[in-house]
């Protein structure tokens, strides 16, 4: 069965606050049965949740981000949904929730995309369909203990790159610690992100045009890089000698998300013959980097043109779109859009006929 072409839609003026797709997918878990229900499609953007649910009151929730893109042959490719299934299972365990089984997670993602397939942007458009799986404690529970019921759902929306298509200016956060070493910074929960909003808004209003994004450092020494507020940190070093390969620098941090996009970049870099270096990266070491990128599902690959450290009055500057960034960006984009072969097996073709008769 043919996948429908994109709906009539003003893709370039899309407002992410609107949700006018056809609906979302829901699954429910009850402690009484110990099982998740089969996924069902709900033709509404709203959920029915008890007001005393731990997901609302105690932050017992986790989420993921995935993207789907349309190829020139009108196929739809979903990028690494299995990796998100594995990561969300780890996040759920961290906040005392039953993990969603791998196959149920992936099937629910395919269902949500298939039944909203006409909202996957055209192949030649610079956007994608953003897929948001989330899970939370949903039944009444006043005490600080697991509730009897949980909801897993998958929402989708047409999506334009989070930070646009230019370079970013970053400010190192010095008045706020995003996560502690033995805290929850390594899992994808809303509590890691909501407190950052006011600090991000404050940074945007600073003098000299403001800052696009915050860069967080470790809470203990305030010197080692964790990640950006919205994405992972990647540095590069150009080859110093003609026969030496360039390097990709990935900060080691127990308080940062294990980024799927960063992992993908590392695999691409390895296929180019570049060296991958995973080690702690200090603020001082920013001066030795050739390029810096912010990478994530919603952000994509975005070059960072400068990083500001106010307390030492230092600004680290980088190319707005260096050669290593351009090679990584083009290669990843071509794989995700079906323009080149996917030797890594990252893209899953949409199982459209399984859900649409």
Curated annotation (Swiss-Prot):
One of its GO terms (molecular function) is branched-chain-amino-acid transaminase activity. InterPro entries: Aminotrans_IV, Aminotransferase-like, B_amino_transII, BCAT-like_C, BCAT-like_N, BCAT_family. One of its GO terms (biological process) is toxin biosynthetic process. It comes from the Eukaryota. Disruption phenotype: Does not affect growth and sporulation, but impairs the production of HC-toxin and related pathogenicity. The modification N6-(pyridoxal phosphate)lysine is found at residue 188. Pathway: Mycotoxin biosynthesis; HC-toxin biosynthesis. Pyridoxal 5'-phosphate binds at residues 87, 227. Transmembrane segments: none annotated. Its cofactor is pyridoxal 5'-phosphate. The keyword Nucleus does not apply. CDD domains: BCAT_beta_family (cd01557). Gene3D superfamilies: 3.30.470.10, D-amino Acid Aminotransferase, subunit A, domain 2 (3.20.10.10). It is an enzyme of class 2 (transferase). It holds the Pfam family Aminotran_4. Its EC number is 2.6.1.-. Keywords: Aminotransferase, Pyridoxal phosphate, Transferase. Belongs to the class-IV pyridoxal-phosphate-dependent aminotransferase family. The genes involved in HC-toxin biosynthesis, called collectively TOX2, are organized into a diffuse cluster that spans >500 kb. All of the known genes are duplicated or triplicated within this region, with some variation in copy number and chromosomal location among different race 1 strains. Aminotransferase, part of the diffuse TOX2 gene cluster that mediates the biosynthesis of the HC-toxin, cyclic tetrapeptide of structure cyclo(D-Pro-L-Ala-D-Ala-L-Aeo), where Aeo stands for 2-amino-9,10-epoxi-8-oxodecanoic acid. HC-toxin is a determinant of specificity and virulence in the interaction between the producing fungus and its host, maize. TOXF contributes to the synthesis of 2-amino-9,10-epoxi-8-oxodecanoic acid, an essential precursor for the production of the major forms of HC-toxin by the non-ribosomal peptide synthetase HTS1. This is Aminotransferase TOXF. The gene is TOXF.
